[in-house]
């Protein structure tokens, strides 16, 4: 049974100004169905796709970090440093996209379980061979680039130009990293 926490009435302190009420606006009430933009784009579905891409970025961060730790080969030092840059970049990418979602007054999942529920299918690393690990990560980076391209087009439809511009940048980052891995794999 729920017992309400006892409420203690505070008395105002003498000479201490009380904080202004209403300084921070309350979040807007959300309609039950997905919101529509002026161009009749489905903003709610767009945000779900953004959250799905955030989940993908978080998984890429984990994957690149674990490959960074487990990779062995004659080119270890270069690959190790590159993958450190990558997992740090994926964290920054996740954070940036999540902040765009919040700027549109939508919430992110509260834990890893919520992110996993939103996650699209991702290629998993199943071998400790360096070339195999990098090959899987390469495919996932290519997929990241394609997902960001699709989301860029959706962002245009709902007039989210900040996200549209960021998706174009993310496409470039994903394909550049994929190219660098492909060039590394050709020499192994």
Task: Describe the residue ranges of each PLM region.
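Intrinsically disordered, compositionally biased, charge-dense segments
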Residues: 1-40
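A structural signal for well-ordered alpha-helices, especially hydrophobic packing surfaces
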Residues: 54, 61-64, 68, 94, ...
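Intrinsically disordered regulatory regions flanking bHLH/HLH domains
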Residues: 30-51, 99-109, 113-130
């Amino acid at each position: 049974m729920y017992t309400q926490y006892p409420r203690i009435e505070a008395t105002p302190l003498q000479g201490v100004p009380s904080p202004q009420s209403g300084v921070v606006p309350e979040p807007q009430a959300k309609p039950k169905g997905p919101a529509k933009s002026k161009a009749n784009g489905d903003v709610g579905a767009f945000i779900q796709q953004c959250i799905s891409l955030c989940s993908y970025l978080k998984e890429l961060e984990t994957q690149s970090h674990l490959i960074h730790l487990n990779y062995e080969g004659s080119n270890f030092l270069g690959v190790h440093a590159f993958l450190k840059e990558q997992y740090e970049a994926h964290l920054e990418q996740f954070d940036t996209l999540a902040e765009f979602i919040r700027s549109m007054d939508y919430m992110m999942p509260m834990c890893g379980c919520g992110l996993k529920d939103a996650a699209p299918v991702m290629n998993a690393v199943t071998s400790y061979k360096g070339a195999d690990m990098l090959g899987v990560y390469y495919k996932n980076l290519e997929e990241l680039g394609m997902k960001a391209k699709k989301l860029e087009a959706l962002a245009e439809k709902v007039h989210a130009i900040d996200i549209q511009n960021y998706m174009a940048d993310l496409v470039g980052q994903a394909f550049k990293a994929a190219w660098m891995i492909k060039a590394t794999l050709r020499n192994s």
